């Protein structure tokens, strides 16, 4: 069972590993490695309130019932964000990172659905969008499956090349 939760100090090792994965920088605004200190400060200063912080980063947890002793095993498998929040126009960008060992298992799709439920149902956003490199076909496939519409090709959007703007509206 997948759930989204607020970042906690114990998430620092995961964030440090993920934020410093240079293979993911082409699809993000990260341009240089982040220190543990930088990430610790981020965790300490984030309130979890998108209106105050302008963004909301949530940890993706996967819980499984261990049948041998009926205990719940919880594993951090990624993070998902709403960022570039525009309260007036009720829209935000979405981005996610799925740990390599969790990819291809439907985690991204489930996490996007949970975040959309929150964004549209609780925050009352009217638009969520993602800007995805044309080379990131796995991510584009998730957004397509989740009902996002590719709207604008963005020529030379990054140093790596073109990107696509994916949008999902809610009335």
Report each predicted region and the residues it spans.
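Acetyl-CoA-dependent GNAT
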Residues: 34-101, 170
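Acyl-donor (CoA/ACP) binding surface of acyl/acetyltransferases
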Residues: 1-3, 7-12, 74-171
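Residue-level detector of secondary-structure transition/capping positions
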Residues: 23, 32, 46-47, 147
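A short, well-structured alpha-helix characteristic of acyl/acetyltransferase catalytic modules
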Residues: 1-41
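Short, polar/charged, Gly/Pro-enriched helix-capping and turn/loop motifs at alpha-helix termini
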Residues: 29, 53-57, 126
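Generic structural signal for secondary-structure transition and capping sites
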Residues: 12, 23-24, 48-51, 124
């Amino acid at each position: 069972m997948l759930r989204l939760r607020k970042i906690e100090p114990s998430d620092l090792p995961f964030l440090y590993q993920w934020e410093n994965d240079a293979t993911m920088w082409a699809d993000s605004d990260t341009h240089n490695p982040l220190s543990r200190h930088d990430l610790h400060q981020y965790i300490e200063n984030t309130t979890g309130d998108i209106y105050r912080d302008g963004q909301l980063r949530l940890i993706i947890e996967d819980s499984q019932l261990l049948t041998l002793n009926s205990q719940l095993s919880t594993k951090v498998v990624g993070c998902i964000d709403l960022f570039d929040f525009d309260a007036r126009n009720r829209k935000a960008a979405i981005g996610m990172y799925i740990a390599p060992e969790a990819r291809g298992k439907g985690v991204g799709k489930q996490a996007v659905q949970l975040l959309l439920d929150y964004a549209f149902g609780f925050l009352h956003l009217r638009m969520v969008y993602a800007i995805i490199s044309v080379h990131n076909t796995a991510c584009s496939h998730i957004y397509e499956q989740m009902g996002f519409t590719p709207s604008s090709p963005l020529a030379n959007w990054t140093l790596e090349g073109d990107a696509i703007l994916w949008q999902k509206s809610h009335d």
